[in-house]
């Protein structure tokens, strides 16, 4: 109803895949029924770009970091004395760019207070370079699918496709899990990647897979939890 209300005023409805996605589950197979016009995902890492790109929605947009705030999420200075937002942007873009070569994103942007960049002209110059690189990468996707080797990889955990690419948080929130490092590596590799559940295994999905990765902590949903007790 809310989306219909937005459309009735001639506007487009986007969902922010960070603060306001709970309950709409972009990977539950029915997300498209809502009728959103686009999805926005803030990103630090490549796997988050793939998380956004794989959703059934017309427009996929990334909100790049660092945000235009005086301090970052961890409290370190960003757009203030002692901060180096250009270095931050380079670090995050290097990670995100790998994934953009594998899956198409339609738009990129920044969030925060625009006036804060006035004292950081090098940041503005670098973001101009980022925008040019993004347009070039997007133009490659307009020409066709990227090259993939024949290897088909499946990441196996309890959630399966419902939690494709993610461990329910940013990299700095989930870095202690081996699986998030694996997801990040896969996000930029030229292989077909899918996320499967143990129910999928029961229904024969492994016949379409060359490599299975199960890398969650023992006993957790990311390894399969009690699914391993089913013999």
Regions found by a protein language model. Give the residues of each.
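Glycan-processing catalytic domains of CAZymes
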Residues: 1-230
């Amino acid at each position: 109803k809310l989306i219909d209300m937005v459309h009735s005023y001639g506007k487009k409805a986007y969902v922010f895949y960070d603060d306001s996605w709970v309950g709409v589950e972009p990977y539950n197979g029915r997300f498209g029924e809502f009728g959103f016009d686009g999805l926005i995902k803030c990103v630090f890492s490549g796997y988050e770009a793939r998380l956004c790109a794989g959703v059934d929605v017309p427009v996929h947009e990334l909100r790049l970091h660092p945000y235009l705030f005086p301090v970052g999420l961890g409290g370190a200075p960003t757009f203030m004395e002692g901060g180096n937002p250009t270095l931050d942007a380079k670090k995050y873009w290097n990670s995100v760019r790998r994934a953009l070569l594998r899956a198409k994103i339609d738009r990129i942007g920044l969030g925060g207070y625009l006036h804060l960049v006035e004292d950081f002209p090098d940041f503005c110059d670098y973001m101009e370079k980022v925008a040019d690189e993004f347009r070039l990468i997007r133009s490659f996707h307009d020409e066709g699918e990227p090259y993939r080797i024949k290897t088909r990889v499946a990441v196996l955990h309890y959630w399966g496709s419902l939690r494709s690419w993610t461990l329910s948080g940013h990299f700095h929130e989930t870095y202690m899990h081996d699986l998030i490092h694996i997801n990040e590596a896969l996000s930029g590799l030229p292989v077909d990647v899918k996320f499967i559940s143990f129910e999928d295994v029961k229904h024969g999905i492994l016949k379409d897979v060359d490599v299975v990765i199960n890398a969650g902590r023992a006993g957790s949903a990311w390894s399969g939890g009690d699914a391993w007790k089913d013999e």
